[in-house]
Amino acid sequence: MAEVDISHSKKKKQDKTENDAADTGDYMIKPQSFTPAIDTSQWPILLKNYDRLNVRTGHYTPISAGHSPLKRPLQEYIRYGVINLDKPANPSSHEVVAWIKRILRVEKTGHSGTLDPKVTGNLIVCIDRATRLVKSQQGAGKEYVCVARLHSAVPDVAKVARALESLTGAVFQRPPLISAVKRQLRIRTIYESKLLEYDADRHLVVFWVSCEAGTYIRTMCVHLGLLLGVGGHMQELRRVRSGILGENNNMVTMHDVMDAQFVYDNSRDESYLRRVIMPLEMILTSYKRLVVKDSAVNAICYGAKLMIPGLLRFENDIDVGTEVVLMTTKGEAIAVGIAEMTTSVMATCDHGVVAKIKRVVMDRDTYPRKWGLGPRASMKKKLIADGKLDKHGKPNEKTPVEWSRNVVLPTGGDAIIAGAAAAPEEIKADAENGEAGEARKRKHDDSSDSPAPVTTKKSKTKEVEGEEAEEKVKSSKKKKKKDKEEEKEEEAGSEKKEKKKKKDKKEEVIEEVASPKSEKKKKKKSKDTEAAVDAEDESAAEKSEKKKKKKDKKKKNKDSEDDEE
């Protein structure tokens, strides 16, 4: 028996050692020449396929603030939540949304697009912070299943299918008679339509349609009847998709919402409520993603643009003007933005704006502030505290010269700024020369007292050389000034000579003999000359002409009087 027990124990030991070896073999770090890929296909919501994103940098400091969308505390989870609701028939969309607001005891609710009271189906209800995404959901495409009744029989099913197919593309529509909007003609796009079923006996047509937001299916049914030549109207309608959420994406009823809140109130069980409400990130999964560093998150929440240093990862095929979602490393949506760079520029550029913000989703101060911590900002805070800058950080009387030189620049473009920046350097150079001259004088005085004659000679020669250089510079400047003054005087003299010549020409023209033909020529010549002369000279010439004419008239009058006598 003892031998049997010993053999049993040996077998057990062998089995254990084999299992341990297998385990160690599984968990040993294998030598590899490449980084093993992480399978992120099962990661939640915005983090799905995270490894396929382009990496700008992997260096950032993780901050413990914020929560993964599915692991937020319940109250925060509800505030950042959306419900894919199956709207019941008869109550209006606004009534349904108001009931949910009252059931969940929240501040705000919104929906993805109004459904008529009799229409059922998909209605995305946004709660509190998620209401900021309502506009984007209202403009998203929609899908419907409709039952239309034709006013008389159409025997050929193919004819119905052709008529339905012709109602695709851009279509003119006027809102129905019973509608809450102004009945203006508008253009809406119908992307696709399929005939699902046709009952010739009851004249019923069942079809599926994918269309632009704001399309009236009731009007489409009337148009279908007109195309078939029998008339028709809408019998029933159900929305099966709104944006990216459809009937199969966790659609719940009003009863589910009420029951989930009741279960939580009575048994503190969150699971049902978390199943009914989804994180708002669910409706942003169709957007291109930009992953932001934790230190840049709060700045974006305050409205700052996303710059290159704050970017961690980015998606392929981003163009300028593309709508993108800015997300944290935990998978939270920060904001919806508009890209200012393409994917290739993001990969190569080291500065600039990546995206500007369209709508901020995240609350401010969810993450700590991480701007204003650099040396420049801390210096500014210190100056404000000491009263050397005003409370807005603007210079006052006590502001140090160094700070104001760096901060306050004249307006008027780069040229003026460059000139202003260059001017102080010349002044500095003159000041330095002056200081150097004073230092030389001091050295000279000191050297005269000192007994070493060699050093004094050197200093004297240096001073003499410096003075000669200064005199040369001054003399060259004076020469330049004199040359400029002489040039100006020469130009002024030449202008005076030209004016005198013009006056002489005018006088010669005026002194010509007055005859009817010569007077006309004289006027033409005077006009040509007057065009080239200043306004003052013109007035003088006109006065002299008038005087001469008066004299001529007087002479003629005298001659006529003499003839009469």
Swiss-Prot record:
PUA domain: from which residue to which, for each copy?
A: 287-362
Q: Mind listing the UniProt keywords for this protein, alphabetically?
A: Isomerase, Nucleus, Phosphoprotein, Ribonucleoprotein, Ribosome biogenesis, RNA-binding, rRNA processing
Organism lineage string: Eukaryota, Viridiplantae, Streptophyta, Embryophyta, Tracheophyta
**Underlying gene:** CBF5
Tell me the organism. Arabidopsis thaliana
Cross-referenced SMART domains, in alphabetical order?
DKCLD (SM01136), PUA (SM00359)
Task: Please give one Gene Ontology molecular function term for this protein.
Answer: pseudouridine synthase activity
As for family, the record states: Belongs to the pseudouridine synthase TruB family.
Which positions are catalytic residues?
D116 (nucleophile)
Q: What is the protein's name according to its record?
A: H/ACA ribonucleoprotein complex subunit 4
Q: Subunit info? A: Component of the small nucleolar ribonucleoprotein particle containing H/ACA-type snoRNAs (H/ACA snoRNPs). Component of the telomerase holoenzyme complex at least composed of TERT, CBF5, POT1a and a telomerase RNA template component TER1. Interacts with POT1a.
